[in-house]
């Protein structure tokens, strides 16, 4: 098809199709969040500073607007700033946030959140966690314990474990994806800070090396600037201005 692609638009279309084929491999790649009939539990992981807590806040707003009952859990208990930031998002979008005393056991805060979510017929429970990659063993133990606690209340949860990655960090994002997928099973990626400069070509590398789909994409500062990932639109964005 490339021989016929003399015009830039035709060439761009062929390349986009190729990139989408490459990304979706056998066309079998689920980019959608797996919402459940009852409670959907979403666990968010990722290093500090990649927009993880902000993404949770924006998603809370989005899901609430869709008519879902949303609750947040602040399980990054060792960073006072993280708890305060999530609590502030809760106030801003008017959804409840479950917190514990400072430096309390994250798993116990998660347990409280799970119990409350069941009691209050919540549709979507989103859990913010610590991102201390420099101490992998501790983080792994913490996330494993959180996972066990979640399963004790809802055996098939968490339904999504989403890794937040900053698109502008390039190769570093791939390294983080590798590290986190060793620590905990990751079902999808929230790609943040996609704007003019950060094209996020790293999603192709992550797809190729780790087989983890991007499920959500954050593309700006405003509260509405987050949404589902569509590979074709994304590949088109990667090529904007290049051809």
Predicted features, each with a name:
Residues 1-75, 82-102, 109-118, 122-127:
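Primarily NTPase-proximal linker/entry elements flanking Walker-type ATP/GTP-binding cores
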Residues 52, 76, 128, 166, ...:
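Acidic active-site catalytic centers that drive phospho-/nucleotidyl reactions
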Residues 85, 105-120, 134-243:
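Conserved catalytic-core segment of NTP-binding enzymes
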Residues 130-132:
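Short glycine-rich anion-binding loops that position phosphate/pyrophosphate groups of nucleotides
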């Amino acid at each position: 098809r490339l021989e016929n692609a003399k015009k830039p638009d035709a060439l761009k279309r062929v390349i986009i199709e190729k990139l989408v084929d490459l990304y979706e491999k056998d066309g079998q790649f689920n980019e959608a969040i797996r919402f459940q009939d009852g409670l959907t539990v979403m666990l968010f992981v990722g290093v500090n500073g990649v927009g993880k807590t902000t993404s949770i806040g924006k998603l809370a707003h989005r899901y609430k607007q869709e008519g879902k009952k949303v609750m947040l859990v602040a399980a990054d208990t060792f960073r006072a700033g993280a708890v305060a930031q999530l609590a502030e998002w809760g106030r801003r979008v008017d959804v409840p946030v479950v917190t514990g005393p400072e430096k309390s056991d994250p798993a116990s805060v998660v347990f409280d959140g799970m119990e409350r979510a069941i009691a209050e017929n919540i549709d979507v429970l989103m859990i913010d966690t610590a991102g201390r990659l420099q101490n992998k063993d501790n983080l792994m133990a913490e996330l494993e314990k959180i996972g066990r606690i979640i399963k004790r209340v809802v055996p098939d949860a968490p339904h999504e474990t989403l890794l937040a990655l900053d698109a502008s960090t390039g190769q570093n994002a791939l390294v983080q994806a590798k590290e986190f997928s060793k620590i905990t099973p990751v079902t999808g990626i929230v790609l943040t800070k996609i704007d003019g400069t950060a094209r996020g070509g790293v999603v192709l590398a992550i797809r190729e090396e780790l087989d983890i789909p991007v499920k959500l994409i954050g593309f700006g500062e405003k509260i509405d600037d987050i949404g589902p990932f569509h590979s074709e639109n994304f590949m088109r964005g990667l090529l904007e201005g290049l051809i």
